[in-house]
Regions:
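Phosphate/nucleotide-binding beta-alpha loop and adjacent structural elements of enzyme active sites
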Residues: 1-241
């Protein structure tokens, strides 16, 4: 009698099963206590590990926008690509404190700037629930929610001479709005894009066409950056050139 039950291993490729057994050396980083370590950040560099070297060189000497900075794990990795500065946006009170601690204990203050703002389509206010890597905006359940201020990427960098080399977004379902608020920056600088598209189904279908409509010659790939999860940590990677 045929069984229709699946093993967990059936949902992963052979390569992913091998990666699951790998030990990630974090000894060169100082990690604050009380945070969840997201292995894909260090293993696949938020998706940068899938890009050719000639594309990665475009980050050197330019600005990185880290949307959804969490405790600064992405910033630790991004420094390997020698940006001029990393702006780490993290609006959650407790997480922002961890971000500042990471910057301090790793002596990254000359390169990494913590920004206690959320990112969105336009400036405004919102309420957010949660204190870890899965905090999310709420429009109805305000109990125990934190009010946060929001800016757009276009507004934040308006009037500045900064050239953006990379935009990374993992903002718990607000990615589409953030991209809509960054279109002028994308048109101007054509940065590498690392956009999480697994929080909301519509993001998987709408974000790429929105960027395609700009006619900037972007190439795209979709990669699952985590070898440990079936669907989460799916990232739309875009680059020009």
């Amino acid at each position: 009698k045929k069984s229709f039950l699946y093993k967990v291993e059936d949902f992963f490729t052979k390569k992913e099963l091998i990666e699951q057994k790998k030990n990630i050396d974090l000894s060169r980083y100082n990690i604050p206590n009380g945070v969840n370590i997201e292995k894909p950040v260090f293993l696949n560099k938020n998706g940068l590990a899938f890009l050719p070297k000639r594309i990665l060189l475009k980050i050197k000497g330019k600005i990185i926008v880290d949307g959804g900075a969490y405790f600064g794990d992405s910033a630790l990795v991004f420094l390997e690509y020698t940006p001029s500065r990393v702006y780490s946006f993290e609006p959650v009170n407790l997480t922002y404190k961890k971000l500042k601690e990471t910057i301090r204990i790793n002596k990254m203050g000359d390169i990494v700037t913590p920004i206690k703002l959320g990112l969105g389509k336009k400036a405004g206010k919102a309420f957010i629930k949660g204190t870890n890597s899965a905090a999310s905006l709420t429009t109805s359940d305000f109990k125990n929610a934190q009010e946060i201020s929001i800016t757009s990427i276009d507004d934040f960098f308006s009037g500045k001479n900064d050239v953006i080399g990379l935009i990374k977004l993992d903002v718990e379902g607000e990615e589409l709005g953030v991209i809509k608020g960054a279109l002028e920056t994308i048109k101007r600088d054509k940065p590498i894009l690392l956009i999480s598209v697994y929080h909301r189904p519509e993001d998987f279908f709408f974000i790429k066409p929105l960027i395609d409509d700009l006619n900037l010659g972007y190439k795209f790939m979709i990669r699952k950056t985590s070898s440990f999860r079936v669907t989460s940590e799916t990232v739309l990677i875009g680059y020009s050139g």
